[in-house]
Amino acid sequence: INFETIICHIIVFFAFTSAIIYLCVYILKVPIPHSFFYLGKNGLRYFSYGGIYYDQGYSNIQFGMNLNRMTGPFWEPGVYQIFLNYALYRYVVIEKSNKFVIALLLFDIFFTMSASGWLCAIVIIVIGIAKSPKFTNKSKIFIFIFLSLFGGIATKFVLFSKFSETFSNKSSAYIRMNDFLLGLKIFIENPILGIGFNNTEPFMMRNTYNDTGILGSSNGFMTIAYTTGIVGMVFVLLPFIYNIIKRKKERYKSVLYFIMIVFFNFSEPVYYFPFMMYILVKEYRKAFKNSTLSI
């Protein structure tokens, strides 16, 4: 059994169900039975559609329209895009899947309205096309220009909303920037070993600009840095770098994969999620086997 294939098939399943529910509820306005539940210490209310799609039920102004951001089976669109882009990478760069699956993943990524998700998807598509023998050089240049223009314009709209939307009267971009700076400051104060594995309380106590949860920061990579120091970062990054060096053919795939995983952790606090633990263990297993497998 290929566990990687199973994971990506599950992601595609949720991408399909999320697309159907999103289209029915928010585009076609078809009423679907749902329940409510409350999450976190602030008691944020979520709509639950059969336990496979969650939504807070409010919309944002995107492209001049009121649009709900697609969250899939998660509480946050930014987390959902991580899984979507993970599958997109595999089906574009590794396995060359059918166009329907790729289009489905891109549809969901678009409606997450996640700037980081869009950027990651565009890079994956551009590299996939650049390395594909099916496209002529002229076609590649045209597609690259189109994606760059589309990505730039679309990202501009999303980033504008990031700076204008409020969370306790502060934009999410403001919060992310300050999370990074505070995490960096704590890391500089404790560079070698950090302040302790999974110890996010000092960050929470010094955070005066936002209500911080137990994850400690919106920047997962910086949380690894300030809690475990240089030693922890070496432990996390070493197998990826080693596997890149050991790979002889198509090294760009491993480089892109490494950048993507680091980027995921920069954009969301997913550093200790089982999914990220699986990815880290997989890289160590590959390193110990001294092989150059496909991912």
Show the residue positions of the predicted features.
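Transmembrane alpha-helices of multi-pass inner-membrane enzymes
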Residues: 255-295
